[in-house]
């Protein structure tokens, strides 16, 4: 049975990689030539996934793109996560550009950053990027052109805002925190941390919370407990299940909402229960 599962996984990954090659060949826009005429000037705020893909697409269509990023490098939220972090959903639903090629269904942080760097280099996005630049003000002049941070000497024909919803790591204040004898860490600070023999409490049951508990157990924690406001669906990483679950946000427009949660629990919680027990 194990050999059959391994064979099926290998076939699935092969077909997935073949699909990515086809997408790359058919849909990747060509990088512009150095002497290509410019269509106009566009400012892109943010150098995360959306900012990077937007800038690459704009440059491929001949626009003169300037990227503003408050961090010291591109990458967005993936610059702040642990080296053990990886996608919680299938990467087939996380393709931010046709050029991207994932070698696994659930790539890790370094793989995702490498794909971002490939797109970045291919479209020469480093030619006009302003790192360590926080955009605090955006205006339009009388001619309808965009002004960034009050610099009226530099204007843009278009503006793309890609700041996203994820910000910098935020530590919440806790009552009696100073008198607590243990260590208090943010979920983004787990690299190379020693959990051997410790009892760990994770506040929050989202993706990073589950990942933190898993990391603690893998590194020898005696026990890991997740505190969450409500139940969450924590299921094994399976491509078909991922695709099915993505239908839920659309509610009654699909029949997925009819599936009882108890059935999901019975079928997919068991692996987590076994691991946490």
Range-by-range predicted roles:
Residues 1-41, 167-188:
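Extreme N-terminal leader/targeting segments of oxidoreductases
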Residues 3-12, 44-126, 228-239, 258:
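Beta1-alpha1 glycine-rich phosphate/pyrophosphate-binding loop at the start
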Residues 34-36, 47-49, 54, 58-74, ...:
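Rossmann-like dinucleotide-binding core of oxidoreductases
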Residues 39-41, 132, 196-198:
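Phosphate-coordination loops involved in phosphoryl transfer and adenosine-cofactor binding
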Residues 77, 95, 137, 147, ...:
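Conserved beta-strand positions that form and line the central face of beta-propeller blades
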Residues 93, 129-130, 182-185:
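Conserved beta-strand scaffold positions in the cores of enzyme catalytic domains, especially
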Residues 100, 136, 142, 189-192, ...:
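Residue-level detector of flexible, active-site-proximal loop/helix-junction positions
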Residues 105-167:
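Feature captures the FAD/FMN-dependent oxidoreductase FAD-binding
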């Amino acid at each position: 049975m194990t050999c059959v599962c391994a064979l099926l996984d290998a076939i699935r990954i092969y077909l997935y990689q073949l699909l990515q090659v086809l997408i790359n060949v058919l849909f990747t826009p060509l990088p512009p030539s150095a002497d290509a005429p410019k269509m106009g000037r566009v400012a892109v705020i943010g150098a995360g996934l959306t900012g990077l893909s937007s800038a690459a697409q704009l440059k491929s269509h001949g626009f003169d793109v300037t990227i503003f990023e408050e961090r010291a490098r591109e990458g967005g939220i993936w610059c702040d996560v642990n080296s053990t972090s990886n996608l919680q959903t299938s990467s087939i639903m996380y393709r931010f550009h046709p050029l991207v090629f994932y070698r696994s269904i659930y790539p890790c942080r370094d793989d995702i950053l490498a794909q971002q760097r490939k797109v970045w280099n291919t479209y020469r996005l480093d030619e006009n990027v302003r790192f360590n630049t926080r955009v605090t003000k955006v205006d339009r002049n009388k001619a309808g052109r965009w002004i960034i941070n009050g610099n009226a000497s530099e204007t843009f024909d278009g503006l793309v805002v890609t700041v996203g919803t994820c910000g910098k790591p935020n530590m919440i204040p806790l009552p009696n925190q100073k008198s607590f004898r243990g260590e208090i860490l943010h979920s983004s600070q787990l690299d190379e941390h020693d959990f051997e023999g410790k009892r760990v409490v994770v506040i929050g049951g989202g993706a990073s919370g589950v990942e933190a508990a898993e990391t603690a157990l893998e590194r020898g924690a005696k026990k890991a407990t997740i505190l969450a406001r409500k139940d969450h669906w924590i299921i094994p990483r399976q491509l078909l299940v991922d695709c099915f679950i993505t239908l839920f946000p659309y509610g009654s427009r699909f029949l997925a909402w009819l599936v009882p949660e108890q059935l999901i629990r019975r079928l997919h919680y068991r692996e987590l229960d076994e691991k946490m027990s």
